[in-house]
């Protein structure tokens, strides 16, 4: 027994002496956790799953050092580590397959990672300590490179700690390519360029995330001379991007295409035939610029954007009741009627109090509670999806669980109570402030002060939310402006500079980050005037490109680089209104006067199977993904043989019926049908074929109805192109 004890003491003394002389002590937080992360041990598909695997439950990607230390050292009755025989530890034997392991081989015997884990065990398995160096930031170099296929690049990753010391952490960091067809990366940061395109290599270390961007040009950019003469900020910055990617733009769209496009994007409305013909005949070289000003000041502008923001704010009678729904809708209309500054728009919503029936913005706080308000505010006004960080460190962003609850602290003193201001049947709720209420970390119980993502602690003695709004409106903080720019870019181009448009994060970089930053600065400089942004977008030649891709732009199939306009199907509401417009009819909705267009409705609960089939959202989520753009067989059947379309085509006061009663010549009737659907005159061959079909019809009315029906079923009608 004495010999055994003596041997153990000698082993411990020797281990301590050797590590102290030759190496610093292995840190669980800074050395062990990165190894487990690189090996995939704490990933969602392995021991980082909600309930772990094989009896071992680790925190997802190693963001909870204390819990993981307990699990490894004390869990399973201490069988996972052996101080007497470190190499016999299950922590080493399973990942090297010296013991059965369902997760496969994760470590090589004798590798640096294996040696580090063995040393940590031999040194006594020192756990997380206040003496551990606190990690501060991650630097990834190079930031960006334009490469050729087959080229090899080495990523250097440096970590900086709170004591300002730094080290190369490339051997500890984790590397992942976001698109392996463009570039691959190994676990040491060695990148191999593969095929044309652009991607980022995501680098993770101790909760920090960084990226390296690599571009492999598609070819050589051509046809940029005409763009070089344009002073538009957007055009200038896309020229530079096209040069980097080796892409070339399509030609400029026709006047009719442009006119239709700005009406659908800005007003959710088709232009009428008279307007189209007048615009086409106008010889003024500034006519496109003038047309943009007109649409920005049309009353339909208010309808369109009030409806869109009603989607994002979940304006619905199901939760808000009818009075709350109308209150918020009318307030949204006033916002866009008066062209309210968008930073003030955010501020009024986030600091609202009082009766939601009397104060539209207060409805923001009727839906859900503190956590929901936090997630909605972040997603709608910052474009950041915070839901992951509620339970663990965000896996693809530098957002910790503490950041989530620091954000909730802004809303921790907001409360709601029932009110009788509108009578006992009013179901009104009053939003008010309390003097108490804190946010605490769910694991440590620590009280967290109000602090925005990436910002400083911002206290306000009266209303904590004022601190958040002050931070959002700070001219030196582009976060709010970047979100608005990216959202509206997505609405106009069919794809955000960051896509999806409400998923802004470091590992989902913009297709043109310099342009996004420049437009955000420009929006701030112009007092968050959203019409200024839309004016800049629509006046750009990039926006006015044809939706037809040429040989040079065909490589940009998803239109990530805006080499052509991305054709997009009309929304459910736009499509119903467009069908009504083309047919000369009006859909009657319950509880509102005849003449209310679909795009003018306050919520999505007005009965319409047509709009539901075409993807109208239920308004239960703030995610843009709630609106479905997917095509399906029911949509095709509805357009080809549905009762709604047949009814509208044959109505007594329809466009076709008026042609017949007014004895409009067939050639003029054909012209108007084309203008009312495709926003252009028929081409010579189309006109010839239409006249021939009408001559074969049983009567002119039936022939014109068939023509209109056929045009309503074309892609050219259904899509904004």
Annotated model-derived regions:
Residues 583-586, 591-592, 597-600, 604, ...:
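Long, His/Glu/Asp-enriched segments that create or flank divalent metal/ion-associated functional microenvironments
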Residues 228-300, 308, 312-590, 621, ...:
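Primarily short, surface-exposed interaction patches in extracytoplasmic proteins
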Residues 1-27, 114, 118-152, 158, ...:
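Post-cleavage N-terminal segment of exported redox proteins
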Residues 28-43, 127, 295-302, 338, ...:
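Short sequence/structural segments immediately N-terminal
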Residues 79-82, 459, 627-628:
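Short Gly/Pro-enriched turn/cap motifs at secondary-structure boundaries
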